[in-house]
């Protein structure tokens, strides 16, 4: 299953050359065999079981936001500034300054973010764990993190590793003369590695992830296994700047960056530091996860010379881009356009470029010996900014307008290190910029009086008497809330963007039916709001969720249970102007097993896509199971298809789906008419009883899912089924409500 990500380009002080790790690592095959090994087609449910809460040593009651808000952030920053220029003998600082190393560390922590599934990014601090801690592109970042340990040790639980890894790079830029636009805390630490689809390759630095048209398979963003973005020497090691530009555009686009942001990031990032390729990669030992226990988490032990300082081997590339590697300047763009560049090789054997003009050979200071000077270098991916016509136009504009470049880089950098954090309401600390940016998916503030319990009861009555069916109300609420992704905290019901482009036109949402439902709900909203004399209002975002809740309460009542589905008002309605249409397009469900919807363009099976959807919603196996069972009997399939509606009382919330699925009175066969559809026949009469998809039948076929389905199919499970369904429903409806904690359901049978 898909989990976290990697996009890629040789960012900052490390650009990685595949040639430097000729025999880096192969996937091992001599381990104990898992069930997945013996039965490769077995549905993998592990995405719904991670992370494991028991792995967290801080305990369930730990409140990171409270801890961070009590932190003296200025003191941390001062300690970081001091650290930048306090060189350690065990890993000497280039030019006496660790700033560029920390920028690279921060970039590589955040730059794994990818738009198609929201995985990757700095949240969680996953650079500490395998595989990221041992990616070739992260070589020697183990030293950067170890340099930070005394500061982490000093401030403890008040600042997470995830926040510290990002803050260090931000402070590094400030300490070297660049003005950032701010920093937000709020990234909580993970305590275990998680499984993420980083690509199909079984060997580091291979690239076998393109489709027949040469495009990266979704949701991947990196072009090579083990790199953050792209091969800095050029695609497949071919030094072609124009071909490199195509790869850069694709991978940075999948990192949520447009062309201008891409140019700003590359040109700004490479204003600092240098690459390291004193010799061949043959001198390097194994990565941290494969190193000896005595190395204590360090990897890439270097047997060349002193193994550090001037003898450092990281990417295989060697040299600095500018004459001021530890001070902000515009020299990167000046050098890029002022020189003609000729191809050469680094001491480590990697392809790079130096000025044709021999007078440039003494421009750049040596990182350790003040008596030595060097020529500036460019990588093939740097030259892409000069020769790609679109990139070149932007880069020249930045060269001619330095202040515009400074602003563009500051904004792109802030976006890079915060893109995976979700809405601005999750930002913590005194350095959060006041400006609201469209990529933060803003929603208006609550500037009115919220509805009370009496209003809620009144509104539910009006909704239920509006002529809208249980199915329509449930489907609309689900379509609105289920866009949420727990990976990057995007989507959800807040904002009511289901009424805006592009969501209102998504096929999964039944656009015509949706328009009818929204029109009715908007009428109820307007009538209520216009009747209030005290400034009280209900948002459409709240009303959509309330409509789904009311329908569920009615459906449970038909089953003999009086329930109240917890509801907390406070959502507001975004405008189209607050919504970046292109940015929201990646949230479109191409499959939603909860609605029995599946677009055949998917490269995964319907059950796999169900697990993926449930994983993004942060659901457990039982929560996924009970939601599917409930949605089926509520007749909530897209297009009103009847697949999996195993009940003769659609619209009644009961456990019929599980009871009938597990009944041995039904024999299932593949449909001879429709691919992917199954038909259930009465074993005695031969009469067709039901039709289903593989998403429906997987709950009887997969042994683990069947165990959960059995729990909901027993005679004494009727009330538990409703209780669990409502709790899971509320979890989805409130997934983006970072201001509240979901309440427990109150059932009175």
UniProtKB/Swiss-Prot annotation:
Documented EC number(s): 1.11.1.21
Question: Would you kindly state one Gene Ontology biological process term found in this protein's UniProt entry?
Answer: hydrogen peroxide catabolic process
Q: What CDD domains does the record point to?
A: catalase_peroxidase_1 (cd00649), catalase_peroxidase_2 (cd08200)
Q: Where is this site: Transition state stabilizer?
A: 104
Q: Which GO terms describe its molecular function?
A: catalase activity; heme binding; metal ion binding
- Name of this protein: Catalase-peroxidase 2
GO (cellular component) term, any one: cytosol
Processing after translation: Formation of the three residue Trp-Tyr-Met cross-link is important for the catalase, but not the peroxidase activity of the enzyme.
Instruction: Write down the InterPro entries for this protein, in alphabetical order.
Output: Catalase_peroxidase, Haem_peroxidase, Haem_peroxidase_sf, Peroxidases_AS, Peroxidases_heam-ligand_BS
Q: Where is the signal peptide?
A: 1-27
Residues that bind heme b, according to the entry? 270
Instruction: Indicate the cross-link positions, Tryptophyl-tyrosyl-methioninium (Trp-Tyr) (with M-255).
Output: 107-229
Question: Required co-factor?
Answer: heme b
This protein's encoding gene: katG2
Q: Where is this cross-link: Tryptophyl-tyrosyl-methioninium (Tyr-Met) (with W-107)?
A: 229-255
Give the quaternary structure: Homodimer or homotetramer.
Task: Keyword check for Iron, yes or no.
Answer: yes
Q: Which UniProt keywords apply?
A: Heme, Hydrogen peroxide, Iron, Metal-binding, Oxidoreductase, Peroxidase, Signal
**Catalysed reaction, written as an equation:** H2O2 + AH2 = A + 2 H2O; 2 H2O2 = O2 + 2 H2O
Q: Which organism is it from?
A: Legionella pneumophila (strain Paris)
- Indicate the family of this protein: Belongs to the peroxidase family. Peroxidase/catalase subfamily.
The record places the active site at: 108
The free-text function statement in the UniProt record for this protein reads: Bifunctional enzyme with both catalase and broad-spectrum peroxidase activity.
Organism superkingdom:
Bacteria
């Amino acid at each position: 299953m898909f989990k976290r990500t990697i996009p890629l380009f040789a960012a900052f002080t490390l650009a990685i050359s595949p040639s430097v790790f000729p025999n880096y690592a192969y996937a091992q095959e001599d381990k104990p065999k898992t069930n997945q090994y013996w039965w490769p087609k077995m549905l993998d449910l592990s995405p719904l079981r991670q992370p494991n809460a028991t792995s967290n040593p801080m305990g369930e009651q730990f409140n990171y936001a409270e801890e961070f808000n009590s932190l003296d952030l200025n003191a941390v920053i001062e300690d970081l500034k001091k650290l930048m220029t306090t060189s350690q003998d065990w890993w000497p600082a280039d030019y006496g300054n660790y700033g560029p190393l920390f920028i690279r560390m921060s970039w590589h922590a955040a730059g794994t973010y990818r738009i198609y599934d929201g995985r990757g990014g700095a949240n969680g601090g996953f650079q500490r764990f395998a595989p990221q801690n041992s990616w070739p592109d992260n070589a020697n970042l183990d030293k950067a993190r170890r340099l930070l340990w005394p500061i982490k040790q000093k401030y403890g639980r008040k600042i997470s590793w995830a926040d510290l890894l990002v803050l260090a790079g931000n402070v590094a830029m400030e300490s070297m003369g660049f003005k950032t636009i701010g920093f937000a805390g709020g990234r909580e630490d993970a305590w275990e590695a998680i499984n993420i689809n980083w690509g199909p390759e079984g060997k580091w630095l291979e690239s076998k992830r393109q489709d027949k048209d040469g495009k990266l398979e979704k949701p991947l963003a990196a072009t090579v296994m083990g790199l953050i973005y792209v091969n800095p020497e050029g695609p497949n090691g071919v030094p072609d700047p124009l071909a490199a530009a195509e790869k850069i555009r694709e991978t940075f686009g999948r990192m949520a960056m447009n062309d201008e942001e891409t140019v700003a990031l590359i040109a700004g990032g490479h204003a600092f530091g240098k690459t390291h390729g004193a010799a061949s990669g043959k001198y390097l030992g194994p990565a941290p996860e494969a190193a000896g226990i005595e190395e204590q988490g360090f990897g890439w032990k270097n047997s060349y010379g002193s193994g550090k300082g001037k003898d450092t081997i990281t990417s295989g590339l060697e040299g600095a881009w500018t004459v001021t590697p530890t001070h902000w300047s515009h020299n990167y763009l000046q050098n890029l356009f002022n020189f003609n560049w000729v191809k050469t090789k680094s001491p480590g054997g990697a392809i790079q470029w130096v000025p044709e003009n021999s007078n440039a050979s003494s421009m750049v200071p040596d990182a350790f010996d003040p008596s030595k000077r060097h020529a500036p270098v460019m990588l093939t991916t740097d030259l892409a900014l000069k020769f790609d016509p679109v990139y070149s136009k932007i880069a020249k504009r930045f060269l001619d307008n330095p202040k515009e470049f400074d602003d563009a880089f500051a904004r792109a950098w802030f976006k890079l290190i915060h893109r995976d954090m979700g809405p601005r309401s999750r930002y913590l600390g005194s350095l959060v910029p006041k400006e609201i940016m469209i990529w933060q998916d803003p929603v208006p503030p609550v500037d009115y009086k919220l509805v009370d319990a009496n209003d809620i009861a009144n509104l539910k009555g009006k909704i239920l008497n509006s002529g809208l069916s249980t199915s329509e109300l449930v489907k609309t609420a689900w379509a609105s809330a289920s866009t949420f992704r727990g990976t990057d905290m995007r989507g959800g019901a807040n904002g009511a963007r289901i009424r805006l482009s592009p969501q209102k036109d998504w096929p999964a949402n039944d656009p015509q039916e949706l328009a009818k439902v929204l029109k009715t709900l908007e009428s109820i909203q307007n009538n209520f709001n216009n009747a209030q004399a005290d400034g009280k209002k209900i948002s459409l975002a709240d009303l959509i969720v309330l409509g789904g809740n009311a329908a569920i309460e009615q459906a449970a009542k038909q089953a003999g249970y009086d329930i109240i589905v917890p509801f907390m008002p406070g959502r507001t309605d975004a405008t189209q102007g607050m919504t970046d249409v292109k940015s929201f397009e990646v949230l479109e469900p191409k499959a939603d097993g909860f609605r029995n919807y599946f677009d055949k363009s998917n490269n995964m099976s319907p059950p796999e896509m169900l697990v993926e959807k449930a994983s993004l919603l942060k659901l457990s196996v039982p929560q996924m199971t009970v939601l599917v069972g409930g949605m089926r009997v509520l007749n909530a399939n897209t297009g009103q298809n009847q697949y999996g509606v195993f009940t003769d009382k659609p619209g009644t919330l009961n456990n019929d789906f599980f009871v009938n699925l597990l009944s041995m009175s039904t024999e299932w066969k593949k449909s001879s008419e429709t691919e992917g559809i199954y038909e259930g026949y009465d074993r005695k009469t031969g009469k067709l009883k039901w039709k289903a998809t593989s998403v429906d039948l997987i709950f009887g076929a997969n042994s683990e899912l069947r165990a959960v389905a059995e729990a909901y199919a027993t005679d004494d499970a009727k009330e538990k089924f409703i209780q669990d369904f409502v709790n899971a429903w509320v979890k989805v409806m409130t997934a983006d409500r970072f201001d509240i904690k979901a309440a427990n359901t109150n059932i009175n049978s």
